[in-house]
């Protein structure tokens, strides 16, 4: 296992402290919003007044301010983790089995618990509660460790969700469709990232759903959930028609095949573009490699 030096640890600590200071400084004029008012219009009025005086702000502060203003238009559907990517455990699982599953499969501090199917989520378990129960040699099922979640619609505004999480004192919302089925998941961390930006681990080599990596002039590695218009802008080629019902690169691939393709499958998208599936489950695409026969912008 690689160990970071004291100098690297100190640098990372200083970066975290700087971020905390920036957020506290910027939020001081609006810290009483959730205590005194429940009206989003009032909240954005405060933010817009801050923007008028933003000349003296640092770059970090201006970026956070811009992200706050975007919350006025963003909904849960814009940021939720889709159903196919949700990691969850059955209610009938015992503590020892859950501990092993988390070690092997679920790299999160919170894990959803469902009864029967994922459409019946009963709550979630925090990993610290699990380890405490194991340390004290508690036996039995998961019910006594389950924490409550909230239910939200995909159309709910992010600021409304943030306020609801605070009122209900929970950090997880299950997104349900019109029939009551589980459509996705949003955590408090997802909301915070929308405000302060994504904070990447220095050793994390995985791509997130907001970008892709240009390897060279003819190769791009991309998360399948990256929007097609991002790829179009990079390669200078139109791939989506106005009446198409997909938004992501994964959706583009699925329009060319009858089922989710296996890892290693190559699909010709156009005369210039070939997409190879590099990561997938039986139900969804995860990551793809995009080969440009003529190079970026035909170069």
From Swiss-Prot:
Keyword Aminoacyl-tRNA synthetase (UniProt): no
Superkingdom classification of source: Bacteria
SMART domains, sorted: CorC_HlyC
Keywords for the protein's UniProt record, in alphabetical order: CBS domain, Repeat
Annotated transmembrane regions: none
Residues in CBS domain copies: 80-142, 145-202
Additional note from the record: Despite the presence of the tlyC gene, the true SFG rickettsiae are non-hemolytic.
Protein name: Hemolysin C homolog
Originating gene: tlyC
């Amino acid at each position: 296992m690689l160990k970071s030096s004291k100098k690297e640890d100190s640098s990372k600590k200083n970066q975290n402290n700087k971020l905390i200071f920036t957020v506290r400084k910027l939020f001081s004029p609006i810290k009483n919003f959730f205590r005194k008012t429940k009206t989003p219009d009032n909240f954005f009025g405060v933010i817009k007044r801050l923007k008028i005086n933003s000349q003296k702000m640092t770059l970090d502060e201006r970026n956070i301010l811009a992200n706050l203003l975007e919350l006025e238009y963003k909904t849960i559907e814009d940021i939720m983790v889709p159903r196919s990517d949700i990691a969850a455990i059955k209610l009938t699982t015992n503590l020892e089995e859950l501990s092993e599953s988390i070690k092997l499969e679920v790299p999160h501090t919170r894990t959803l618990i469902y009864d029967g199917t994922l459409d019946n989520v009963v709550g979630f378990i925090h990993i610290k509660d699990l380890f405490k129960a194991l340390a004290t040699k508690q036996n039995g099922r998961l019910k006594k460790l389950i924490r409550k979640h909230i239910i939200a619609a995909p159309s709910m505004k992010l600021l409304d969700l943030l306020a609801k999480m605070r009122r209900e004192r929970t950090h997880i919302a299950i997104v349900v469709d019109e029939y009551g089925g589980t459509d996705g998941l949003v955590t408090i961390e997802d909301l915070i990232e929308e405000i302060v930006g994504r904070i990447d681990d220095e050793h994390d080599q995985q791509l997130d759903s907001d970008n892709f990596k240009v390897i060279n002039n003819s190769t791009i590695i991309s998360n399948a959930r990256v929007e097609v218009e991002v790829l179009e802008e990079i390669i200078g080629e139109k791939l989506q028609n106005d009446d198409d019902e997909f938004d992501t690169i994964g959706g583009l691939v699925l329009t060319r095949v009858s089922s989710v393709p296996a890892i290693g499958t190559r699909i010709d998208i156009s005369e210039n573009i070939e997409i190879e599936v590099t990561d997938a489950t039986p139900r969804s695409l995860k990551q793809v490699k995009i080969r440009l026969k003529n190079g970026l912008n035909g170069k």
